[in-house]
Amino acid sequence: MMSVWFIQLAIFAQSRIIEVFPEQGKDIENIALALKKAADCKGRPVTVKFSPGIYQLDRAKSSQVLYYISNTTSELDDPDPTKHIGLYLNTLKNITIDGCGSTLLMNGEMTSFVLDKCEGIVLKNFNIDYKHPTQTEVEVLEEGNDYLIVQVHPTSQYRIVDAQLEWYGDGWSFKNGIAQSYDRISEMTWRSWSPMENLLRTVELRPNVLYLQYKEKPQVGLHTIFQMRDSFRDEVSGFVNRSKGILLENINFYYLGNFGVVCQYSENITVDRCNFAPRPGSGRTNAGFADFIQVSGCRGMIDIKNSRFIGAHDDPINIHGTHLRVIEFLSDNRLKLRFMHDQTFGFEAFFKGDDIELVDSRSLLVVGKCKVKEAKLVTPREMELTLSSPLSSEVMQQKDLVIENVTWTPEVRITNNYFARVPTRGILITTRRKSLIEGNTFYGMQMSGIFVADDGLSWYESGPVHDLTIRQNTFLNCGEPIISIDPENREYKGAVHKNITIEENYFYMRKNSSCAIRAKAVDGLMIRHNLIYSLDTEKNKESDFIQMYNCNEVTIKENRVQLHHLFK
């Protein structure tokens, strides 16, 4: 009877539609059954259509699958990287999930969706939210000499045991952790002291109103909002793995789990008209544990457009590859490699036929190139590569080498997006292929609006930029340098990046800020036709706002400086 009333298969002309209806207590089972029917179409185009409503996906009924995901958590912090998945698509093709305005409500610490080895998948027209977000929020109602009185957001669950405060939900809890502060007037956030630090005693004055006592006077302002979390990225909001031809369209990500949407070794991904921000009217000010979109080791075109990114705890968009360190030459054509950063390991980073570059991690310059004949993940931390040709003795004698997978590097377009309420950067990008950042607005980034990196000794996020245009963007009240090109080369032996154009942008400088653009180790840099609005009457020429270090073939021309009075 359930299949008749809650899942219907209809054929109109040559299209197939599988309908899903909300049913209390059975939503996750009904969705799984609809996806099974879609899989039975064997790659023929099919739409899974949700009847409008709220679908609650419970952690206890989720698909539990082990995944190692870039930039998440270490094996010490999370010995079991099993993900609890609400919407699970595995080896499926040509399927559209149309939410028709429905909400997928996660109940517990969960990964809202996974697309694994899929092709031609469209997710559109729905909302993703969490019943009890893993980031809690409180607002300061009163401050005294040794106390705060705070209002707890209704979605934040707490318990008080022996006068000690603990936040909790299904699958998670924390007592200490990390905090970020939000100011309603300036519409800005920053990393800050946490009201959980040095907390002596907690008393519940009434439901969701707490008295927090300290040894010393808390240095906070009235109506400050604290966003608190632990540091463990043991789930992600979404995971696109080894997939291609993926479209995320018109999705409201009201909350993004313990990390954002991670795209890993996938190709041709489009994000269009998506909203990464708290639900309007919810009273929440934060929408994400860390990054909103993390693109790691992808290829093809990454196209992110017409979207809003508001309320992250880290960079809203981060696009990079992964440097693995050479730890042993097994022979002249066999290498042992290691994932070096605690949060990134466990997945295949190289495949047969891939082009690779061996890189001096201190200078970030290429010392050798080759093709992969065979690749094997021997442990979650180590890979072995067999190369198609032997390496020279000169290369094998070098120390501190890392390897980038050149085949898995994407083209990028990031256009017509809005970024706000972010304590870090707006966009971090390191890819060698043609990239365009155009028509975006960045408001109140506490660090750079755009950051061009590359490193082989810290985060091990690769690689060099070879063709990047930053055009017609507006930067309002951002940290400096507003555009930062700062590869982490410890020794300068030549340019790391090349062919970067920064043109026709609008920079509205904040008070006491004097660096719009800072560039390091670039060959071929064009900075032209930008308009810099300054609060400083003594700085009135372009050279006052542009800094260069070890750059060659630089053209700086026709940039104007004007006074403004927006951010005094």
UniProtKB/Swiss-Prot annotation:
PbH1 repeats lie at residues 87-125, 243-265, 299-321, 409-431, 432-454, 465-486. It comes from the Bacteria. It is an enzyme of class 3 (hydrolase). Transmembrane segments: none annotated. Keywords: Glycosidase, Hydrolase, Repeat, Signal. The keyword Coiled coil does not apply. Residues 1-17 form the signal peptide. Gene3D superfamilies: Single-stranded right-handed beta-helix, Pectin lyase-like. Pfam families: Beta-barrel_GLAA-B_II (PF23764), Beta_helix (PF13229). One of its GO terms (molecular function) is alpha-galactosidase activity. Its EC number is 3.2.1.n1, 3.2.1.22. InterPro entries: Beta-barrel_GLAA-B_II (IPR056441), Beta_helix (IPR039448), PbH1 (IPR006626), Pectin_lyas_fold (IPR012334), Pectin_lyase_fold/virulence (IPR011050). It catalyses: Hydrolysis of terminal, non-reducing branched (1->3)-alpha-D-galactosidic residues, producing free D-galactose; Hydrolysis of terminal, non-reducing alpha-D-galactose residues in alpha-D-galactosides, including galactose oligosaccharides, galactomannans and galactolipids. The keyword Transcription regulation does not apply. Belongs to the glycosyl hydrolase 110 family. A subfamily. Alpha-galactosidase that specifically removes branched alpha-1,3-linked galactose residues present in blood group B antigens. Has no activity toward linear alpha-1,3-linked galactose residues. This is Alpha-1,3-galactosidase A. It comes from Bacteroides thetaiotaomicron (strain ATCC 29148 / DSM 2079 / JCM 5827 / CCUG 10774 / NCTC 10582 / VPI-5482 / E50). The gene is glaA.
